[in-house]
């Protein structure tokens, strides 16, 4: 299971599509799944873009999202989520090729 999620967000629709395509919810469940409380740090069950995303710091094609994902694992984020062992970065959809990364603590391995 993913503890914290960083998603490249050049367009809002892409974030929604990415979350659905990665199996966090089914397309027909979007209205119920996409709530502000779910993605809010630190108490949501899937904190999203804890460094602020493109609006705050990472438009350099997602590099900052990878840095934030690792900071969450190391316990060094300015918006730290408790007990992070698995952090995921999504860099799409809408363009190809794209890549995704899953970073894990030693405990998760």
What does each model-identified segment do?
Residues 1-109:
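Claisen-condensing/thiolase-fold acyl-transfer catalytic domains that form or cleave C-C bonds
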């Amino acid at each position: 299971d993913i503890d914290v999620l960083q998603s490249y967000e050049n367009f809002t629709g892409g974030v929604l599509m990415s979350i659905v395509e990665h199996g966090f919810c089914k397309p027909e469940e979007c209205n119920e799944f996409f709530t502000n409380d779910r993605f809010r740090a630190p108490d949501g069950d899937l904190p999203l873009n804890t460094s602020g995303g493109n609006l705050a710091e990472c438009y350099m094609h997602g590099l900052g999202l990878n840095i934030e994902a690792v900071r969450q694992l190391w316990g060094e984020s300015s918006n730290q989520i408790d007990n992070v062992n698995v952090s995921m970065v999504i860099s799409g959809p809408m363009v190809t090729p794209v890549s995704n990364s899953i970073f894990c603590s030693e405990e998760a391995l």
